[in-house]
């Protein structure tokens, strides 16, 4: 559930970023409605990969961030398949935290869908659409986390970076591969919150 993911990511961000003081309590009901509005909006944007066309998601997210006064830039090797990088500054005591979600989805066989895959239909307590759990839920949660940090003027001991990544579904050369090669200083962080991840354990020790 996206709103639950938002709460988890916001709490994780607050914990890792080390708040200088507790933020004021937000209006969670209004936030739930706003989260759903952005969630459905990005689900209705066709970024199925191939061909990708993640630019529609990057532009939507940038528009939301711009209205909140959060600095964001769209960068990429392909104008139709860019990434977005946004940053909220902390006091610099610690290295940044990176929050990521990818904006592309896999393709669809529409004949197998109860509701159209780009409809973001709410039915029976569920939201139906391509990308609902991979990965536009995390993308929306990351976006809302940035909005909350900004609106509540949360004091942070580290910068929080948000990335909307293109090309995760099998074509990472335009996404994280490009970002690491061309924009690493802007995404360099101590920790990353994303859909994936893992550790290597050797002799019972995590390496």
Where are these regions (language model features)?
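N-terminal secretory signal peptides that target proteins for export/translocation
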Residues: 1-3
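Positively charged, low-complexity intrinsically disordered regions
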Residues: 5-6, 22
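Bacterial N-terminal signal peptides
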Residues: 7-17
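A generic structural signal for short, non-catalytic loop/turn and secondary-structure boundary residues
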Residues: 11-13, 113, 155, 186
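A generic alpha-helix preference that emphasizes hydrophobic side chains
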Residues: 17-18, 39, 44, 139, ...
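Acidic/His- and Gly-rich active-site-bordering loop/insert found
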Residues: 22-132, 149-158
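Acidic/histidine-rich catalytic neighborhood of metal-dependent amide-processing enzymes
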Residues: 126-127, 133-207
């Amino acid at each position: 559930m996206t709103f639950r993911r938002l709460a988890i990511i916001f709490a994780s961000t607050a914990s890792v970023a080390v708040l200088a003081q507790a933020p004021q309590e937000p209006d969670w009901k209004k936030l739930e409605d706003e989260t759903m509005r952005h969630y459905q909006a990005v689900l209705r944007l066709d970024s199925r990969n191939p061909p990708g066309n993640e630019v529609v998601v990057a532009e939507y997210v940038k528009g939301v961030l711009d209205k909140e006064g959060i600095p964001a830039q769209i960068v990429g090797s392909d104008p139709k398949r860019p990434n977005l990088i946004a940053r909220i500054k902390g006091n610099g005591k610690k290295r940044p935290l990176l929050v990521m979600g990818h904006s592309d989805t896999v393709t669809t066989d529409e004949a197998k869908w109860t509701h159209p895959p780009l409809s973001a239909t709410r039915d029976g307590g569920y939201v139906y659409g391509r990308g609902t759990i991979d990965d536009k839920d995390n993308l929306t949660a990351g976006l809302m986390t940035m909005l909350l940090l900004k609106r509540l003027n949360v004091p942070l001991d580290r910068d929080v970076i948000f990335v909307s990544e293109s090309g995760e579904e099998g074509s990472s050369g335009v996404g994280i591969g490009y970002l690491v090669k061309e924009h690493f200083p802007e995404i360099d962080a101590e920790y990353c919150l994303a859909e994936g991840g893992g550790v290597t354990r050797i002799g019972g020790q995590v390496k």
